[in-house]
Structures are given as structure tokens and as C-alpha cells.
């Protein structure tokens, strides 16, 4: 099966938009459960994933979608939305093969932030690889007017950028503070704390931060791919902490975790890649 790039992108954007809207409008009491790895999951996560899967699978029944949660379709066809029709500037509307596509879905990134009402760290993340390479990234912030940011190859949607800080800004969670690792950083810096992998990477995309260093076997494919496509289209770097490309397996039968951690650098922070890699020489993952 084949489709045009523009049609495919519009289906994905519609799916993210609808899922994001469902999160922002959820009014029932949130029920928290715990997965085998100890992470939280709620009915809001599963509802969001059902919406995304239903919209995409209705159009492309055989497509390979890997979602964080263990649910798939669930929305009746007669309740599916009309697909949005955006144009993408001078981007070539090429024909793509569905069999060469893998979609990675995090229906609610930052679930623990969501349950603690830290809504600025909540995102919906949908990323796509084509023939094994990152191709499309779509990120929505449900509690910021369902703001959607996306990149298709090197085409980037409109992004609000913050004024650059005089210091280099590191972003991490308080739980996984990295201050002890970067004491010898060569220039003035500051550490800001934020939850959610997607929110940390989006902070770099919006110029609120410069470096995200995560030297743990914790982040998964669906946590990183969407924002990776956007950040790389801006000219930034996304890799593991040793400088290798992040891996995106084709099946949940393989580990979805990034076993060598995650490192993200803004365009202006790329010059610090050698320094960050030197830190990683002391860390065994």
C-alpha cells in the first residue's frame, strides 16, 4: 500500500490533535495504576492511545504502530474526525510505502506530571521512521491550547522561540539531577528542572534549554523520536550519551528502551558534544 506524504502527515496531525483535545477536556476522576516497571498509567493514557490508533488504523489498517500502552483501536468509525488538510510549503509531496513506515506513540508523555497537575510537562508524542530513519515528529501540549509542533524531514511548523539565555541551560528532572557530573563545564551554565522526556526536548526546541543529558537506561523510543525529528530539523543533535544514533526497533518484542541513554544538544550547544562525550567515558551503561 502506498500513500502521499502530505496525506499521511495530515492523518497523523489529526490523530495527535484529537488525542490532545481529549486529554485537555478530561473531567472524570483520574484512576492511577502501576505497570510492571513501576511507572504510572491512567485511563487518560489509554483513551488517548485508542484515539490515535483508531484514526491512523482506519486509514492505514496494516501500518506498524508501536504504542507505549497495551491498547489499540476503540473508537467507532462513525465517530472519527474529518482529516485536517494542511499544506507544507515547498516540501515535496512524494509517494511513500506503508510497509516502510513505523509509528511510535506516547499518548501521554509525563503521566506522573499529569497526575500531580504539573501540566507544563505533559505532551502527546508521535514519531515516524521511514526505512529505518527518523522522518516525521509531531508533539502536542494539551494544556497550552493544544499547541502542535511538527517536523517532516527538514520542514518545520511555526515554533515560538524564547530569547537565548546568556548561560548554557541544562535540563533534567530533580530525581535524576546531573549537577555532580557537569561541575567542570567550561562556560557559565544553569540547571533547570522539568519532568517528561518530551517536555525536556521541547524546552530545547523552544530555546528554553540547551542540553538534555540522561545517562540512564530509562527513556524509550516513543519518548524521543517525535521531538528528535524536530530538533534535528532545527540543526540540533540527538544521540546516545556515547554519540551513537538512537535505535528504533520494529517490534515491541525487542527492547524499546535506549540502553545507552539520551543526549540532546541545541544548535548553539553542539560545540559541547566533545565535553559531554568525555563525561560519558566515566559512565558504564
Swiss-Prot record:
Signal peptide: none annotated. GO terms for cellular component: cytoplasm. The keyword Nucleotide-binding does not apply. Optimum pH is 7.5 (with 3'(2')-phosphoadenosine 5'-phosphate (PAP) as substrate). InterPro entries: CysQ/Inositol_MonoPase, Inositol_monophosphatase-like. Gene3D superfamilies: 3.40.190.80, Fructose-1,6-Bisphosphatase, subunit A, domain 1. Binds 3 Mg(2+) per subunit. Coiled coil: none annotated. Disulfide bonds: none annotated. Partially inhibited by Li(2+). 1D-myo-inositol 1,4-bisphosphate binds at residues 109-111, 173, 195, 197, 200. Its cofactor is Mg(2+). Mg(2+) 2 binds at residues 106, 109, 223. Its main location: cytoplasm. Optimum temperature is 60 degrees Celsius (with 3'(2')-phosphoadenosine 5'-phosphate (PAP) as substrate). Active between 30 and 80 degrees Celsius. One of its GO terms (molecular function) is inositol-1,4-bisphosphate 1-phosphatase activity. Mg(2+) 3 binds at residue 68. Belongs to the inositol monophosphatase superfamily. Catalyzes the hydrolysis of the 1-position phosphate from inositol 1,4-bisphosphate. Is also able to convert 3'(2')-phosphoadenosine 5'-phosphate (PAP) to AMP but with less efficiency. Monomer. This is Inositol polyphosphate 1-phosphatase.
